[in-house]
Each structure stands twice: as structure tokens, then as C-alpha cells.
């Protein structure tokens, strides 16, 4: 247990978003933020080479090329690192695709850094926590009779 530092890789071309995210994670001693200031479609192995605990991808979820690039990344990672997607696009088709790709979470801009940090921490905790947040459906049947 000498080194408990988790690396989070941020892929974004939005300089303001990158700076805000760096500032948000700077206070944490257990999380190291590594940034790649490229478009998701321009990545050529940066994520594969980086040993990361989670990946934050800032992308346009309505852009088919970027969705295909995200699909390649999810296949490359093979579930070893959760992916958190940050997008400005929020429509049913984009949500359906992100759910099918099994991203850990997706957030819509504008967002607060607190939401992003919370989402990343939840993603780093892994799937073992999902059982605690699973929804439960209760059905109440009224008594019928006379």
C-alpha cells in the first residue's frame, strides 16, 4: 500500500475545461490528473500507453466520428478503466449510444467541477458499489374485496 495514487486521464481540446479540471483535482493527494489536449479522433495510443484508473473524455456525442473513436477506446481499455464522458449534446440517441458503450457516467456541459470530481470518484470505486445504488421498484396492490 505504498502508492495509492490513482491516475485520471483527461482528453479535451477545451483549454478552460482542462484548467478548471486541473484546479479541481490539484487539492487531491490520491488522484493525479494527466491531460491530453487533443480531439478524441486524433488519439493514437495515448490512452493505451497510459496506466490510468479512469478516463475523462470531453467530446461531441452527436458527432459520429467521435462516437466511433470512443468505441475504439472502450474496446482498447476492455473495462480496465472506467470512462466518464463530458458532452454538450444531450439527446436520446446520444444517451442510448453512451449506455450501450457502457461508459461509467456522462455529464452535460456546463457542469460544476464538483460534479465532475464526484463522478470520477464514483467511477474509480468500481462496479462493486453499483449494488448499493441499484433502483428498487415497489408495487402496492390495494386490497380488493367486499
Where are the language model's segments positioned?
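Conserved acidic segment of CheY-like receiver
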Residues: 4-25
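Short hydrophobic/Thr-rich beta-strand motif most characteristic of the beta2 strand and flanking loop
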Residues: 30-39
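Acidic, metal-coordinating helix/loop segments flanking the phosphotransfer/catalytic sites
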Residues: 38-53
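Conserved phosphotransfer microenvironments
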Residues: 53-73
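A short, hydrophobic beta-strand element within the central beta-sheet of small alpha/beta folds
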Residues: 80-90
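C-terminal output helix
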Residues: 111-119
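Walker A (P-loop) phosphate-binding motif
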Residues: 130-146
Amino acid at each position: 500500500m505504498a502508492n495509492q495514487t490513482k491516475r485520471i486521464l483527461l482528453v479535451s481540446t477545451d483549454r478552460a475545461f482542462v484548467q478548471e479540471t486541473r484546479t479541481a483535482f490539484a487539492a487531491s493527494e490520491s488522484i493525479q490528473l494527466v491531460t491530453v489536449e487533443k480531439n478524441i479522433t486524433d488519439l493514437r495510443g495515448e490512452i493505451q500507453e497510459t496506466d490510468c484508473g479512469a478516463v475523462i473524455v470531453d467530446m461531441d456525442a452527436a458527432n459520429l466520428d467521435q462516437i466511433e473513436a470512443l468505441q475504439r477506446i472502450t474496446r482498447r481499455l476492455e473495462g480496465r478503466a472506467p470512462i466518464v464522458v463530458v458532452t454538450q449534446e444531450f439527446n436520446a440517441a446520444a444517451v442510448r449510444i453512451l449506455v450501450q458503450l457502457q461508459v461509467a457516467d456522462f455529464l452535460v456541459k456546463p457542469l460544476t467541477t464538483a460534479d465532475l470530481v464526484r463522478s470520477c470518484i464514483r467511477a474509480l470505486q468500481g462496479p462493486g458499489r453499483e449494488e448499493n445504488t441499484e433502483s428498487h421498484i415497489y408495487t402496492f396492490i390495494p386490497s380488493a374485496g367486499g
